[in-house]
């Protein structure tokens, strides 16, 4: 049983609000260039991999999955680093969380339930991540639980919660701000 099984939804919403405030704070700090460099060094093997680069061919909302994954990864890295968490796992898991190699909108046309992508793609992403990279158990949890609460399995680690929230913040940004 995960520690997150004990928390009510209100507490998770409060955490979401706190992470949003922390995000706004960390973006304005002067050491952004140094942090971007640190982040890139942690994930450059993934960013340069031929299979991962294929994500540039698939759309997310208003951008490519590649760009979305980079944003989620960097935001997760910044929050995890600021809170003293495993920022390397957050950065790598955040980058690999949507590592599926198909156009989900085309698939949605043929999906009778019109909902399977949201529940299945974390496991497809994990399978791809394990095929091309070394993935530890924390990164596995990050990848498979990033769709919480759409998927009912609760995140096991605090870094998984950070990536899940970062994914939602990034999707909102892409959908609303960049529309």
Question: What residue ranges belong to the model's regions?
Answer:
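Metal-dependent phosphohydrolase cores
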Residues: 2-179
